[in-house]
């Protein structure tokens, strides 16, 4: 029942779902439909306004806003800190994806492209480069293929599209028309921490016209947002309520956790909404009934239950034909109505119980 306003610095709402994920992974029409639902609910979008630059939180407080949710993501790019990184042909993968998502131009770039990184974002950058005019795309990662942070499905799709993998290599320097790599002997040290070691005597040089860096993301803070932050730039907040050191400011998504999945940010949004609802009603506890550790759930993993679960291989949607493998369109089909019913029927009998802390009275029936 609260009036809600979203301030967005870009010309379109949607954040990283719109500007950070290419259409062949997530169709823009899907996000646009969801945003139309939000508008129909009465949510106001103020676009092209950067909080901290065009308007401050104090300005908004003076206008009557009582609680704030900061979900600005991790839209910066980490640096390699190697010679030649300031070369004109070097660009961050995040900036490149933002450019691609704005225009989807098949002639955006030219020549051979090198993508540095091994995560899902690096795969997106490589596949987007292939669709944007690149002749060849080389994806270079520290990890061996089986150890890459990217999901195996994403890696397989990239290989099927012709992207060339160079696994076990770390960048040494960037030249005018090429990038030099040194062999990565190990990615982690004996304690399991990220601490790559190299053999500088084994080098590989790749000729290229563009170098796209996708080795991680960083936080670009809001000017004047005087909240406590962690050494890595993420905002500190209470784990259950997502309340920051400034009592009327709540936080969620990548700016709180560092780069994670979109569903994690969505989950934070729901929890923060509950916190803000309680916050504006003075005297209400932000924490009562919300700590899941206080609920003692039956340990099903160590119980002998004589139930025959469905362990059949899951259904895989088909592929759209006739659009070309280098199309910006998502080629994955959706489930048929019959398939949806089959999957939903499985959900009804999975045996898992989820505690809704807003409704649970501790009766124990779910166990």
Predicted regions span which residues?
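Mid-to-C-terminal Rossmann-like scaffold of FAD/NAD(P)H-dependent oxidoreductases
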Residues: 160-162, 170-173, 187-188, 281-349
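Glycine-rich dinucleotide-binding loop and its adjacent helix/turn
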Residues: 36-53, 77-132, 229-246
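Rossmann-like dinucleotide-binding cores of NAD(P)H-dependent redox enzymes
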Residues: 6, 10-41, 45, 126-173, ...
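FAD-site-proximal beta/loop scaffold in flavoenzymes
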Residues: 86-110, 174, 189-260, 267, ...
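Feature captures the FAD/FMN-dependent oxidoreductase FAD-binding
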Residues: 32-82, 172-180, 185-187, 210-212, ...
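Residue-level detector of alpha-helix initiation sites
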Residues: 12, 119-121, 256, 365
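Cysteine-centered iron-sulfur cluster-binding motifs in ferredoxin-type domains/subunits
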Residues: 1, 254, 341-367
């Amino acid at each position: 029942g609260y009036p809600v306003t979203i301030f967005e610095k870009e010309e379109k709402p949607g954040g990283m779902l719109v500007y950070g994920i290419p259409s062949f992974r997530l169709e823009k029409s899907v996000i646009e439909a969801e945003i139309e639902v939000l508008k129909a609910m009465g949510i106001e979008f103020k676009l092209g306004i950067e909080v901290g630059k065009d308007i401050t939180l104090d300005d908004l407080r003076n206008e009557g806003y009582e609680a704030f949710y900061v979900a600005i993501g991790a839209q910066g790019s980490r640096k390699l800190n190697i010679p030649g990184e300031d070369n004109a042909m070097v660009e961050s993968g995040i900036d490149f994806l933002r450019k691609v998502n704005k225009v989807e131009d098949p002639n955006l770039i030219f020549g051979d492209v090198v993508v540095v990184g091994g995560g899902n974002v690096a795969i997106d950058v490589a596949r987007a480069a292939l669709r944007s005019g690149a002749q060849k795309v080389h994806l270079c990662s520290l990890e061996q293929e089986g150890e890459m942070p990217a999901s195996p499905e994403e890696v397989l799709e990239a290989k099927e599209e012709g992207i060339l993998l160079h696994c076990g290599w770390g960048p040494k320097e960037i030249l005018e028309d090429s990038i030099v790599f040194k062999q990565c002997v190990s990615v982690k040290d004996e304690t399991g921490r990220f601490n790559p070691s190299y053999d500088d005597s084994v080098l590989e040089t790749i000729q290229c016209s563009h170098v796209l860096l996708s080795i991680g993301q960083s936080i670009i803070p809001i000017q004047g947002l005087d909240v406590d932050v962690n050494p890595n730039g993420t905002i500190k907040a209470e784990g259950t309520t997502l309340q920051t050191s400034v009592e009327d400011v709540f936080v969620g998504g990548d700016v709180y956790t560092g780069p994670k999945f979109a569903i994690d940010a969505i989950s934070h949004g729901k929890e923060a909404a509950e916190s803000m609802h309680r916050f504006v009603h003075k005297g209400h506890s932000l924490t009562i009934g919300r700590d899941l550790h206080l609920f003692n759930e039956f340990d099903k993993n160590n119980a002998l239950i004589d139930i025959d679960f469905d362990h059949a291989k899951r259904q895989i949607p088909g592929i759209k034909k006739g659009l070309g493998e280098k199309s910006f369109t998502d080629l994955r089909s959706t489930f048929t109505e019959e398939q949806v019913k089959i999957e939903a029927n499985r959900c009804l009998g999975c045996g898992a119980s989820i505690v809704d802390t807003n409704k649970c009275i501790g009766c124990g029936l779910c166990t």
